[in-house]
Amino acid sequence: MAVFALSPIVHLTVRVFEGGTGAAFSLLFRQRTLDLAVRTLVLTLVVALGCLIVGVLAAWLVTRTDLPGRRFFAVALAAPLAIPSYVAAYVWIAEFPVLAGLPGAALVLIASCFPLVMLPVAAAFASADPGVSEVSRTLGRNAFRTAWTVEARGVVPAAAAGTLLASLYTISDFGAVALMRYDAFTLGVYSAYRGGLDRTVAAVLGLVLVVIATVLTLLERRLRRGATARTGSGVSRVAEPIPLRRWVVPAWSVVLAVLTVSVLVPMLGLVRWMIHSLRFTIAWRDVLTAMLTTIQYATAAAVVVVVLAVPVAVYVARTSSPVGRAAETAVYIAHGLPGITVGLAVVFFGIRFLPAFYQTAVLLIVAYAVLFLPLAVGPARAAIVSTSAAVDDVSRTLGSGPARTDRRVTLPLALPGIAAGAALVFLTVAKELPATLMLRPRGADTLATELWSATQVLKYGEAAPYALALVLVSVVPTIVLDRAVRRRSVPVREAPVEVAS
């Protein structure tokens, strides 16, 4: 799989050196490239911090507390993944033009990406054994201090993986930064590809994105180094939810504020477009066809990516070999590239080595696998790391080999993380645009491509049915994800946990 992940980098390298080494270095060190790098890094840092704070807090509230309506909020807080960032950006910039620039781009991307942190962290909270927290409380620490000093350490791998995904999404996003008029690397790449026949500028900028993605991946690996779960009994159970008591109203305020920014405002904009579209004849047959095509592609991609991701996740979670680290790094680097770069690489290799599959769903699924494999690897690896090592040891002492132990013990315990990855892949594929536009079979339009086509010609009323259908498509996987997480969250009866006054 690392070979597929590295194919866009190979393509970029070939393009860069086609123009000569001197020309490539002159483009690399010009002021324009430096400005784009600084602006991209600033945006990425702001979005990463915002997603980390909002995602971890939201996951803790819906999995570890008695927040009223937490089951509904667990599903609702994943809904932003179904709303394309470029749709949310348009709604916000139309209503609040003053947000143009860094504030608007950061707001939209945090609102769109924090579920990438929340979902794996929620799965990690749900899978964690409460034994360590119980010991902390017997030593006199209250619930909040235990959550901050003990439970937070257990979700470091999941939080780091989710933050990495949010960061990579940020450096590869085009629609939101373009609509918010924030000049970042992706805008430079797209402008270079569109501006002429010489693709060297775009390739050089793409390679800089590779460097940034590599740095982010190595930083994430360092943050989660040594963060493994160690429990004694290996009994699968979850502690009684923490009573919020007088903190219920502040907790509700936080959750509702997040939902307002990430879901309510974009949805109100879509509803207004939908009302406007009623003046025209809506081609419901086209909407239904695009919906079915989207479901088919997203389902196929989710299955393929999970099948590829689970062995990678098991390997990198259980070993620290250079081969495993290199494979994981390659997988994450590809996720930081713009979809058009990956699409062009797949076209490049497809025409030369797999011409029979050009403009078929096969190459499209390959592109999805290259782009979105980290969405499944990260949560699955974090869930595997958080499972009890003692359980694996007991299984092996009873005669089970490593493969059988992984199949019968580790993977079932890691199911919430694997389900989180599958849901993330499904939701992200459903709204993927550049790669789908380039590689889809002729006439096979998805909800995202139809939505983009309508918004490109400012027909926002006609775009509304496709946007709302895209949100509808996301409901089922988010519900499945919520149930998978809650299967690991059924509380056992323990002594009530008191919150410090």
Describe each model-derived feature in a short phrase.
Residues 13-25, 180-186, 227-235, 271-275, ...:
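Peri-membrane helix termini and adjoining interfacial loops of integral membrane proteins
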Residues 37, 140-141, 149-151:
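Polytopic alpha-helical membrane proteins, predominantly small-molecule transporters/carriers
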Residues 171-197, 431-460, 493-498:
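Glycine-rich helix-loop "coupling/hinge" segments at transmembrane-helix boundaries
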Residues 136-137, 395:
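The alpha-helix within a helix-turn-helix
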Residues 122-133, 143, 381-392:
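Membrane-helix/interface signature in polytopic inner-membrane proteins
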Residues 218-255, 488, 492-498:
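Alpha-helical transmembrane segments of integral membrane proteins
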Residues 1-19, 29-126, 154-174, 202-221, ...:
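Membrane-water interface segments at the C-terminal ends of transmembrane alpha-helices
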Residues 26-27, 124-125, 149, 165, ...:
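Short alpha-helical segment immediately N-terminal to, or the first helix within
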